[in-house]
Amino acid sequence: MKIVTYVTTSNKNVKPKWADLVFSIPQVDLKTALVTVAHINDDVLLLRNDVNVLNKDVIVRFFKSFKTSAVVKYGNEVIGYYLTRADKSSRMTPTLTVTHYALKV
């Protein structure tokens, strides 16, 4: 399991790209970070608890562009999103004002 990350920009003209694989994390840390994820076969995108989401509408539209998506909750708190890409050949370049992490197997 490896984790990728990128920090988006507030400049709407700059579109972030999916980052390269950065570093691996131990399974014990992964269990702490992720409360529960049913499948990690495809791309998984999660927001950490301490992430400040500045524009939730943009994020909702972004996740609707994927074939499968689900909200990941801890109790009543939404801590992230699980998704699979509708078209794996295309590279998504969303503009989001949020720091987020994508976990890939």
Curated annotation (Swiss-Prot):
The lineage of its organism: Viruses, Adnaviria, Zilligvirae, Taleaviricota, Tokiviricetes. This is Uncharacterized protein 47. It comes from Sulfolobus islandicus filamentous virus (isolate Iceland/Hveragerdi) (SIFV).
